[in-house]
From Swiss-Prot:
Protein name: Arrestin domain-containing protein D
Compositionally biased tracts (Basic residues): 466-478
Binding site for Zn(2+) 2: 704, 707, 734, 737
Residue stretches of biased makeup (Low complexity): 173-205, 435-450, 608-633
Zinc finger feature spans (FYVE-type): 682-742
Recorded GO MF terms: zinc ion binding
PANTHER family in the record: ARRESTIN DOMAIN-CONTAINING PROTEIN D, ZINC FINGER FYVE DOMAIN-CONTAINING PROTEIN 21
Matches recorded under InterPro entries: Arrestin-like_C, Arrestin-like_N, FYVE-type_Zinc_Finger, Ig_E-set, Znf_FYVE, Znf_FYVE-rel, Znf_FYVE_PHD, Znf_RING/FYVE/PHD
Binding site residues for Zn(2+) 1: 688, 691, 712, 715
UniProt cross-references to Gene3D superfamilies, sorted A to Z: 2.60.40.640, Zinc/RING finger domain, C3HC4 (zinc finger)
Species, as recorded: Dictyostelium discoideum (Social amoeba)
Keywords noted in UniProt: Metal-binding, Zinc, Zinc-finger
Gene name as annotated: adcD
Amino acid sequence: MTTLLNNHHNNNSLPIQISQQHVLINSNQNESNQPSSLFNSISPQKKLSPTLNSTSIPPPPPSSSSKYPLELSEKGQICNLKINLDKSYFTNGETISGKVNILLTERQCIKRVKLQLCGYEKIFQHAQHSNNTYQTFKFYSGNLNIPPLNVNIETTSLNSLPISNSENNSPILLPTTTSTQNSTLSPTLLSSNLNSKSSTTTTTTTGMMSSVSSLSSSFSQQLTTPIHEFESGVYEYPFSFQLPKYLAPSLNYIGYLSIFYLVHCKVDYSKGREWKDQKVMKSSELWISGINKQYQDYLLYNKTHFTSHKLAHYLNWLSFGTNTNSNNSNNNNNNNNNNNNNNNNNNNNNNNNNNNNNNQPSTITNNNINNNNNIGISNNYKSNPIEMAICLRENNCYIGSKATFFIQLKNPLNLKINSIRVELFQQISFIKTLSNSNSSSSGGSSNKNNNGGGIGNDRISNIQKSNKKSSGSHRYHYRNNSSDHNIDKTKVSQTQILLHNYDCRELFKNQTTTSSSSSQEILCSTNLQILIPFKIEDDQVFPTTRGFLSTVKHFFIISIPSISNFKLKIPVHLWQRFDDNNFTTISNNIHSLPFHTSNSFGNIRNSYSSSGSGSGSGSSNSNSNHSSSNYLNEQEENLDEQQQQNYDDEFYDDEDDEDNDRFKLNPPKEWKVLWLPKWKDESSITNCNLCDNTFTIIRRTHHCRACGGVFCEACSNQKVCLYGFGVNNKVRICLMCFDAVKAESSNSIYGSNINSSILPFKNGLPLQNVFSKKKVYKPPYLVHL
């Protein structure tokens, strides 16, 4: 980050924009109350948090920068200061422009006007300590010095000021040259012009020190002349900052992590040139979006990318039924276990214990079936697992929009399912800072530059990301210069954002029956829409150079409460919407953000590119220099009507429905569900399908979960996870399927580039991507098109 700041300094990427190069001097020394009230009347409107809705959640803290007061001044001060930004929300790489207004109630000498754009990271230490303390680090800083001569007068404010002396009614303009009049000058160019006009001589040196000394002497000489003494009035200084393209977005995870940006302005002034210097400081907060506009436009045109997940569960009959029935069955099992301990020769009671054996299929007695009267359980319950396939239509979701799920449920045992539970979680992973002992033992000199401790810039380069994965999440390892055993562990904080239970009796009203060679299977399908609340933040978090390295992830968990351990985790990439036309809507009317409604689907692209119903009149946030929205609208008009109609028909059905007035949602056509194969009937098979040995009392039958064939113990002794089928636990497969696993792993890690010709086909189902692990998608932080 230090290198980035130096590059900005050398390239003069922080220009100052000046509209007029003259100073108006007006003699006003009395009646300071009227200018003060007028100065307060032009204060900008109070800014709101861009992602928090005050109508749905408790009010958030006023600002994430509460530790830094926005004004350091006293009442009745001679010099008052105010910062007015053109707007409050910016994107990476954008120019921040605004004005600094200085109110002088008496004649003063302004010596320096300094601006500083700073980025802060507030990290809470509750993961390390019992109390909820925090540390604040400054990870970005950009400075800009404005010469006092670069002023643009607000004539409307000066005309209303009282004038004590009638002889000074006309303003006095400072003499300026033709080259500097009404032009935009940098502070260096203005200083050189002033140096050429000054009558004083400077000491001549060689090299760079000559120019530096001449500039400093010219500034010091100009400060000693009466030209820098300003009369009472309101003085306006325009400025502009150029943001870098890789800044962390503004966020406020309350109680965990906060990133905020402030524009500080400090003015040094005095009564005279030899009087004691005084200073006044004022700050203004702004919000920066981490989403690149090009990538956001890219998402608008590529919204049809979906992600699908599948879960298969080999059920145990003890987990079926209601709570009462399950308790009765557990009591019966406990009684049977006690009888087994007392009577070792009682074979009838041992039948229940054999049902828990996962290595081979078993049958259920009539007594056990009677304990679950509400559920029809077949004898081959192990060969008919319950399966659920879920398709998330859009992997990239926006805050305030709806996430659409398509669900297909295969229930061969006709289990009674009353509801489906949908949960949204936010997971924040932290890296602990080094302890004081470790920090002082290595690189003690570098720690002095850190604000409040933490990891220095020289140590950040030693942080390496491990390729290994643990529980689906990445781990970051810190390697110390002196010891490789000092590795910081990841601290994870998981918060539940929303919880909804949907009634399945209405959702699964329409059931489709798929016929096969042996039997008919019932397949239930439905769709759900979940509105992502505004109280959540996006997951586009950038690692900073101070404090912790943090990652934020969001995921859905869809489960069936009546079935234990039947949960499916679906990761989602969450984005904050920052359209050019919606800056005012986001800040002033949060609940009017554009999102899908249940009764108005229509054109998908238009619903995502609309500017909302909020009006942007009378607000400074409506100004924008971007043309990406105009480009998006032009591209939208050029789309072919036939392609647009085909795009809409892919997900929506316009057929009339008396029971439902809204449009029907259709799953993507590319979504193909790979269900588990049907087990072969072992009663009609006497030999192993691979070695052709005859089954006996010792050589028992086993089924392959990947192909459904019947094999002996020697030909089906391998166990793997069938991720393509949704089986996350290791199950038994045959040797032929195991060879396909090895062939797939040798070609590709995720199995995406494997040749399907080398994989066997069994029961008409290819085994491609069956054993491959689900790919973990990571949202790109910045995409160059």
